Amino acid sequence: MNFKNRTFKIFNTTYKLKFVDNIESEDNNSTVLGTTDSSLKIIEIRTKDKLGKVINKNDLYITLLHEIIHAIFIEGQYLQANQDEPLVEWTAKCLKHLIDQKLLVGN
């Protein structure tokens, strides 16, 4: 996976994917790894931890999948599922596991 800024579509909606060093959080005790802004159609993925160390690729990939799943639920109007963080995280981890087994690959 090439972790660089790009755009992609979920059906007819274009999202901008941005990889950033830091994502500001209202809670200083937590670290936000990713965000999905449904009004601006922007997904941000944090690439460095609080100490400035690069986050490993596996965690970046799961975070990317997690945020894409949020966008999928939002675009499909599955707003209750979108708010279910354990469901979103579980789905992301399951997809990553299937991708690692090369069950889900591009053409």
Locate predicted features.
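Catalytic glutamate of the conserved HExxH
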Residues: 63, 67-71
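Active-site scaffold of zinc-dependent metalloenzymes
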Residues: 2-58, 71-75, 79-94
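Short, Lys/Arg-rich amphipathic alpha-helical interaction segments
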Residues: 100-107
